[in-house]
Amino acid sequence: MNHQTVLVTGGAGYIGSHACLELLQAGFKVVVVDNLVNSKLESLARVQQLAGKALSFYQADIRDKQALTDIFAKEAPDTVIHFAGLKAVGESCALPQLYYHNNVYGTLVLTEVMSAANVKQLVFSSSATVYGESASPQYSEHFPLGAINPYGRSKAMIEDILRDLSASDRLNKVEKPWKIALLRYFNPIGAHDSGMIGEDPNGIPNNLMPYVAQVAIGKLAQLSVFGDDYPTRDGTGIRDYIHVVDLVQGHIKAIAALNAEHFAEGACKAYNLGAGRGYSVLEIIDAFQRITGKIIPYQMSPRRTGDLAECFANPALALAELNWQVEKDLDDMVNDTWNWQTKNPQGYQ
């Protein structure tokens, strides 16, 4: 039985709620901090129902230092998983100050509170958007960073801050230095196979899979495919899609690594969480049509500025150091997305 307490920021969100379920099932005590701006409390009610266990919930913003300080004093977490943050690329271009204030300043406040409470184990929800353009479509952790939008830059800035924190602890030879895992997600999709929790975006979905699902169920009329002239096997963009349950298992493996003696004191390490292969937009549409029996109407549209032709992970480091790899395939992702969508056509409403 695991008696560790994990504080999860943004725990009511899409990835956060799935992480809370896996943590509870793995025996962790779970404390959630979420401002519910982009999430619904119903997700956590369902998580507790599925797990048959309770978690602690605090409605608070990570920028509220006093609220966080009080929560840390009361709950005494051992590790923090930091999901909280705004995540829409397009919105970040329109509202960069909001993204930097929420994501970067919010993380600064969180780490200040963690330092004061001497909680120095952190798993950070980073993103493949921190990478710059590369000659290779397969991205490894040592590749140069060069985010091209405010969302990606906010994640890259946070990575820099966390690396600086760990370096300062090594420099100052503090007794309990930071141990940090930066998990760079590729494209999380899917849902828990119960169909009780899943992705419930506000308004029009920004991501491909929930958009396709809403077209399939009739909520949206058709899908726009941005670009059909890329140098790829069918002309459409190729991305690395990862099942959300595989993704959150990576966080549990990361906590185990941080707890282990071999994870160096004061280390801050980045890991790609991806499948290591890509699917094109048309391949996603074809899989959805094949599995659901629904026709997905789509139209070809011009490329979006800044979109890469092809991008997928080299996940070898996560396998070697975290003992993590994906177990679910594209059919699982589509089946579980469709199961969630059909059982919850209005999301958590």
Listing of model-derived features with the role each one plays in the protein:
Residues 172-175, 194-195, 261-265:
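Short helix-coil transition/hinge motifs at the ends and kinks of transmembrane helices
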Residues 208-349:
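C-terminal substrate-binding subdomain of Rossmann-fold SDR/epimerase-dehydratase oxidoreductases
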Residues 193-197, 236-237:
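Short acidic, glycine/proline-rich loop/turn micro-motifs
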Residues 190-192, 229-230:
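Short, basic/glycine-rich phosphate-binding loops at helix/coil junctions
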Residues 100, 148-156, 198, 202-206, ...:
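Short-chain dehydrogenase/reductase
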Residues 60, 72, 99, 142, ...:
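Pocket-edge positions in alpha/beta enzyme catalytic cores
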Residues 1-191:
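N-terminal Rossmann-like NAD(P)+-binding domain of SDR-like oxidoreductases, especially those catalyzing
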